[in-house]
């Protein structure tokens, strides 16, 4: 099975991540730096995936070399984009990046972002509505 066939699982991951961020108090309308993770044991293949991610409109970080607990060495990079927490756009990004991962036989390992705290007034306003 290729990774693209697992896209429904990634769509669920995308929604769960958005929900968790918002439930924890992150801003709903903020621009987020979304970092999609790729990995491979073959640097040359990973580099080709990075070129395709760049061509698809993502910023690409320099590849890093990591040693796993079992002693295996892997290489990884992030494909980065600024996005609102828009499920349709995140799902479209996942589709594009899963296809790139399959094309180059590298691992797509999901995405992460940074918490964007709400402004102080937003909490007070929310409390006020809860007490009405």
Curated annotation (Swiss-Prot):
Single GO MF descriptor: endoribonuclease inhibitor activity
Lineage summary: Bacteria, Pseudomonadati, Pseudomonadota, Gammaproteobacteria, Alteromonadales
Family membership noted in the UniProt record: Belongs to the RraB family.
InterPro entries given in the database record: RraB, RraB-like_sf, RraB_dom
Species name: Alteromonas mediterranea (strain DSM 17117 / CIP 110805 / LMG 28347 / Deep ecotype)
Annotated localization: Cytoplasm
Protein's job: Globally modulates RNA abundance by binding to RNase E (Rne) and regulating its endonucleolytic activity. Can modulate Rne action in a substrate-dependent manner by altering the composition of the degradosome.
Organism superkingdom: Bacteria
Predominant place of localization: cytoplasm
Protein name according to UniProt: Regulator of ribonuclease activity B
Entry annotated with the keyword Magnesium: no
UniProt KW keywords: Cytoplasm
Transmembrane segments: none
């Amino acid at each position: 099975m290729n990774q693209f066939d697992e896209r429904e699982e990634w769509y669920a991951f995308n929604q769960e991540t958005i929900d968790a961020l918002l439930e924890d108090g992150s801003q709903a309308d903020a621009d987020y730096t979304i970092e999609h993770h790729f990995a491979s044991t073959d640097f040359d293949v990973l580099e080709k995936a990075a070129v395709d991610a760049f061509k698809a409109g993502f910023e690409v970080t320099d590849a890093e070399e990591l040693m796993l607990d079992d002693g295996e060495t892997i290489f990884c990079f992030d494909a980065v984009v600024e996005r609102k927490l828009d499920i349709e756009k995140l799902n479209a990004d996942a589709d594009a990046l899963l296809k790139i991962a399959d094309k180059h036989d590298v691992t797509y390992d999901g995405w992460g972002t940074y918490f964007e705290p709400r402004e102080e007034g937003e909490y007070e306003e929310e409390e006020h509505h809860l007490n009405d």
